[in-house]
Amino acid sequence: MNNALLVILPLIPLLLGLVWKYSNCQSMAVKSLGLGAIGVIAAGLFYMRFAFEVESSILFLASAIVLAGLCAILGQENSQQSSDICISNLIILGLSLGIILNQAMIKSVFLCGLLGFIAISINSKHQNTFRTKLIFLHILLAIIFSLSSVLMGETLQVFANLFIAVTFLPLVPFHLPFLRIIKDSKGSVSSFWIVSWLTIGLEKLNIIYASLTSEMFFSLTLLAVVSAVFASLASLGQKCNSLFIASATVAHVALVWGLLEVFPHFKSWGIPFGITLAFVMGGISLTFSFVQQRYGWKTLGILPGLASPMPRFGVALVLLVTFALFLPLFQTFSGLMVMPTIVTQDVEILMISILFLVVWLGGSWYFIQMLHQTAFGEARSDVPYSDLRLTEFIAIWALLLGASYSGVIY
């Protein structure tokens, strides 16, 4: 019964999304049934919490995906574009839950399905560039590693899962699929991608953490420093709002990798911080998507002063950015509260200090700069402003509350 439920729950939104994708359903029906499916999944997870011996971290990761899916669908209005967005969110929800909840070959099948969906989504944009070819090669390698990892020896299995982990907890240069899918996604889909993408990466890293050697830890810390510097510089010069959020996410993800050797027991500090990061970045992306649906806004600085004519938007964005500014501190203090540090070598301490300063100071710079380009300043007089609807505001607040619970309480 337990194993069957682990497969059935992800199939509910996946099959609904696939059926609706190739049928002419009304947008209101898609949204209502999508919310109903999420309610059934939430009830199923609640039942599993008490009826079966399921690892608490797995339920926490699955619950994070369900909450993000709820928020991504809840704020949609009744239109054909919103219907397409809800369908994409349901497909992502089903595939992501299948990866988190299941084991061995079933997990690999869901992961290959998600990677295939990513490739199809990117290919639909018909961008035949060298970077696109690299992304497709990356996805192909991830599919091969996912399918073959079940049959590999223990050592090769660790490297295969590590490749998938650095893809979904993106480090430079493995971040290209993440940047492209966030850039190409419409509306709230980009927000949901951020949460589901990082959640899958956290689950993969949790699996292989005990198998990582000291040499791997050192290499990953060095790569994390390079990734943080590169992504922070990319965020500072980024005008496209979706790429700004994606680059900022990559910069902060570097902290997860960089502190792996500082604190033991990744499950106790890494997963809560990763989910907090996903909710905050997903919340900013969701807030931006609501403005983009109204005005087609994609470039930072084009619509300044939004906090004045759109007070709900202003409050939500200021709170999210304030939370984002303190993200590095959440991870450090949450780690120190539950365990001692284990780093003793001077070179490791130096790299970690550089990483922390780059992410914190760089993040403070580009987040405040973004805030001044959007919420503050003088609003344009030629734009018919309309503030966030109640459902949109609730969706953003739900992600904020989720981030607070994960970062402070859990």
Task: Please give the residue ranges for each predicted region.
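Structural signature of hydrophobic alpha-helical transmembrane segments
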Residues: 1-12, 51-65, 100-115, 155-167, ...
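Transmembrane helix-loop-helix hairpins at membrane boundaries of multipass inner-membrane proteins
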Residues: 1-89, 409
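Alpha-helical multi-pass transmembrane bundles of energy-transducing inner-membrane proteins
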Residues: 16-32, 77-176, 180, 188, ...
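Short helix-boundary/re-entrant hairpin motifs in multi-pass inner-membrane proteins
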Residues: 29, 36-51, 71-77, 134, ...
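Predominantly late transmembrane helices and immediately cytosolic-facing juxtamembrane segments
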Residues: 175, 274-296, 350-387
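Interfacial segments of multi-pass membrane proteins
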Residues: 256-263, 335-353
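Cytoplasmic/organellar membrane-interface segments at the starts of transmembrane helices
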Residues: 310-312, 364-410
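Alpha-helical transmembrane segments and their membrane-interface junctions
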Residues: 321-342, 400-410
